[in-house]
Amino acid sequence: METQKLISMVKEALEKYQYPLTAKNIKVVIQKEHNVILPTGSINSILYSNPELFEKIDKTNTIYPPLWIRKN
């Protein structure tokens, strides 16, 4: 999968869900909504290389309710 497409998927996930997302949450959302399998570390490498996106993710170890409970 090309990097630009993956970046746009990450942006879409961050815009769609109003609650804080971790890198793992983003990976799960993208895999479920786009029916793709992402390589390990692909989301992290995108986030770390893009400061604009990295600032938007939750970097704490807070446990949030499962996605199906908090979906808008």
Swiss-Prot record:
<keyword id="KW-0244">Early protein</keyword>
<comment type="similarity">
    <text>Belongs to the asfivirus I73R family.</text>
</comment>
<dbReference type="GO" id="GO:0044423">
    <property type="term" value="C:virion component"/>
</dbReference>
<protein>
    <recommendedName>
        <fullName>Uncharacterized protein I73R</fullName>
    </recommendedName>
</protein>
<keyword id="KW-0946">Virion</keyword>
